[in-house]
Structure formats: C-alpha cells, structure tokens
C-alpha cells in the first residue's frame, strides 16, 4: 500500500500554501524528518510518495503553470536536501512530482530533475507519479513520458496513451517506464 507523504519541501516563505504539511525552512531538518518517516513506513510495508518534488511553494495559481525560480546552488544546498535524504537514508521507492514549473519546465517533464538528479545522481530506483491530473493544459504528458522520469500518470485518460502508443518513441518510452 502507498501513502502520499511526507511533504518534503522546505518553507520558502511564511505565506506558502503548504507550510502546514512541510516540516521546516531548514533543508537538513526537513530531510532528517522525511528520511525517518519514510524509513519507518517502508519497514512496516508501506511505500511513501515523497512530495512535491521539487520547489512546490505556492497553492495560488499552481494549476496554471506557476514558474518557480531558484539557482542550482540554492536547489542543491537547501531545496533538494529533504528529498535526497529521504531517498538515500530513508530508502524511498516512490516520488510525486510537483505541479509547478522549475524555471519554464514543468517538474513532471524535467529530465534534469527526474532523470539526471533523482535517478542518476541519487541512485533512485522506484516510481515517479504526477501530482493529480492535468486539468488546465500546462502539463504535457507526452513530454513527461518522453523525458524518462515519470512512470505513473495520476488520473490520466486513455487519449494520452493512445497518442503515445502511435509513435515508436512513445512505445519505447512507455516500455522503459514500465
């Protein structure tokens, strides 16, 4: 069984819409709590979809392609730390990507985020799921599958799969994701 938790983001500002769900403004503290939560749940037979990877800081307009900006140093030293600790120390086998864009790229279709950092650098072997369904048109599911990072499309209809299954590249990427 799975659990959509813990929320591993850091508090980026005092008015963020999900601060009640996230542990702290300190990446190390949030990471330690996330790793302990994930480790305990995994030991008891439950996998945790650590969420919302990454930089999920606002609820307002997040469904409309909110762009979140941070430089690579800040992302690696602060905002990625809770997720990295949950993967490396807690043994997480499931991640939920965030709604927002990081820069101009939707997090769920970011090869840099989901393949290069999560899978290649941290050694994550597991499932990445999108955060709910695409209701407002900014999530490009074909790009998410083709980017190679997203395995499960939360709440998506069959039209997306029909479109992807009609191309050789789409078929290959869906097989790799499975």
Language-model segments: which ranges?
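Glycoside hydrolase catalytic-domain context in secreted enzymes
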Residues: 1-178
